[in-house]
Amino acid sequence: MDSKESLSPPGREEVPSSVLRPAERGNVMDLYKTLRGGAPVRVPASSPSLAPAAQPDSKQQRLAVDFPKGSASNAQQPDLSRAVSLSMGLYMGETETKVMGSDLAFPQQGQTSLSSGETDFRLLEESIASLNRSASGADNPRSTAPAAGSAAPTEGFPKTHSDLASERQNPKGQTGGSAGSAKLHPTDQSTFDILQDLEFSGSPSKDRSESPWRSDLLMDENCLLSPLAGEDDPFLLEGNSSEDCKPLILPDTKPKIKDNGDLILSNSNNVPLPQVKTEKEDFIELCTPGVIKQEKLGPVYCQASFSGANIIGNKISAISVHGVSTSGGQMYHYDMNAQQQEQKPLFNVIPPIPVGSENWNRCQGSGDDNLTSLGTMNFPGRSVFSNGYSSPGMRPDVSSPPSNSTTAAGPPPKLCLVCSDEASGCHYGVLTCGSCKVFFKRAVKGQHNYLCAGRNDCIIDKIRRKNCPACRYRKCLQAGMNLEARKTKKKIKGIQQTSTGVSQETSENPSNRTVVPAALPQLTPTLVSLLEVIEPEVLYAGYDSSVPDSTWRIMTTLNMLGGRQVIAAVKWAKAIPGFRNLHLDDQMTLLQYSWMFLMAFALGWRSYKQSSGNMLCFAPDLVINEQRMTLPYMYDQCKHMLFVSSELKRLQVSYEEYLCMKTLLLLSTVPKEGLKSQELFDEIRMTYIKELGKAIVKREGNSSQNWQRFYQLTKLLDSMHEVVENLLHYCFQTFLDKTMSIEFPEMLAEIITNQIPKYSNGNIKKLLFHQK
């Protein structure tokens, strides 16, 4: 059942009908006279254009005024346009806003816009002045007499001087009211009723004997501005659906409202004038579409939302402004319905404005933010609402710049695996540029011992590839560059050339096959090449040779240097392929057992290379010569260290052999109970034993001396256990003897403290190659 609302408040006196001017019965009054500034247009009641108004069941019934019999038939009736315009002031956001009917929407495609005179509200003051002259009869003393006519609502309302004075002060009506507090429409009615916003004390359904058109009520500033207080007695009208009370129907391309609230399209091309009709229930219901307030403050788009719902009867009317709903009920978007997406919009209130997104301010209210925004919905046959985004991907009305069709998208360029420059081809088995090709060739053939000034993690790219040759060479090896790959390529190319001469014979005789080398050199980087890259750099001791030497100063300096060398050894061990796969406890255990092995063997290698094993080269700035060896407590320890360098000199150990032997010394001592990842440890150790054999074969070639040399090198590895035992014994003694006052670095002191109980208890297991 359609709800109907009136303006008649109970408990107010009825305006006498004697003050109203008589008018002809059946005439239709133009309510837009004041808004348009023109004279009223009178249409006879028998006009064919009003024929549908007498049919209650018509789909396009117009709202007209039918005067009941015996109601001031000879009195001239005043114009009602001023009262309607004042009532419509609630929906006037600005002076440029159009108010009712088809004037409310912006001109759409194929629709001519209204003249500027229809939207000029400055004519309102002139209309008020003319109404003042026409309503001068209201000062007659007869206007105070009670009306003797029927109790039906009157067709006009007088004006007082106080009311006219208030209108001169506020000629625009109630345009300053907030549109946010207005309830736009219920769920069962698609039109908007502005009368339900008036806060009256009672429902008109209880008392209909008084006139709803009270001049003192219409002239009250607060009556149109006050929101619905949500009282227990809502404005409900008791009636049935067959009563002659239909909402305003909009023709043309605007959606029409059916009885059930659905929208339909009208084929009529006539623009009807909004009209008022006297109802049978002695009250007037004025229905009008909603009005959206358009701001004048530049390109500012304010998205409003509401936090309340108007409860009418047992249904909840959800308020939705700009697509934001405040309840879970049906949601309206003014011009569109979720069930009717194929029809044209009623309003196109916000045309696309080509401005940047930084000029748009969105005022988000307390609505449901999860619902679809009005600006994001797209329907066929309508222009999409612009949200002001300047990005072509966000705004559908902004076309993206045309793509250059002449530039063909070719394959991406191939990059060098070392410096990421554009690769020139496959060099030494790896896709590299010409610069890295030449660098790798010179680095390998020149046997340069590059040292990194940083932490062996320099960035190698096109710009910074020449800053650190050590890291660049390491990256070349990691990429898989190998000089043997070039030789293999030449061999394969020569074999292919020789096989082309006998290609026909090969095709005729399937038993023939292309000759392929039995064994190709390994193109991937070997373990020895990786060990070369991760080898720690030489450290300086910082020893002052200008000061006279002493055992205490030399020993303290050696301990400080040893602490830094231990840190470098930890980094080196973690970079060894396969070592980090061991359990973390096993890694720490191996480092604690082998730190003296690594330092002593590296010292022997430096002494062998730099002084042919005659002096101990701890650092470039600290070399222990024969004179320094004569100091107290120095000779016995230096004698054990010179043994290592002398053996390396005697065997003429190569650099590859030295690297493999040094790695095996890291894996030469374990606890008696074994390691947590013992199987993996045995596999890694066997791998580097084989690498030592490969290094021997590479040095000696396919000779019968390979096994003899392997025996000699492994015998040297076994002898390192005795050398390290003597060195550790002296180290533990100086660490425990506080009278010597020899300083130890923190990390080295921690390792010694943890290692002393294990050696004293004999909880060590030596991994020897030969039985004694």
Swiss-Prot record:
Region (Hinge): 482-518
Alphabetical list of SUPFAM superfamilies matching this protein: Glucocorticoid receptor-like (DNA-binding domain), Nuclear receptor ligand-binding domain
Zinc finger (NR C4-type): 416-436, 452-476
One protein family per Pfam: zf-C4
Cross-link for Glycyl lysine isopeptide (Lys-Gly) (interchain with G-Cter in ubiquitin), residue positions: K414
Posttranslational modification: Acetylation by CLOCK reduces its binding to glucocorticoid response elements and its transcriptional activity.
Subunit record text: Heteromultimeric cytoplasmic complex with HSP90AA1, HSPA1A/HSPA1B, and FKBP5 or another immunophilin such as PPID, STIP1, or the immunophilin homolog PPP5C. Upon ligand binding FKBP5 dissociates from the complex and FKBP4 takes its place, thereby linking the complex to dynein and mediating transport to the nucleus, where the complex dissociates. Probably forms a complex composed of chaperones HSP90 and HSP70, co-chaperones CDC37, PPP5C, TSC1 and client protein TSC2, CDK4, AKT, RAF1 and NR3C1; this complex does not contain co-chaperones STIP1/HOP and PTGES3/p23. Directly interacts with UNC45A.
Designated name of the protein: Glucocorticoid receptor
Organism lineage: Eukaryota, Metazoa, Chordata, Craniata, Vertebrata
Gene name linked to the record: NR3C1
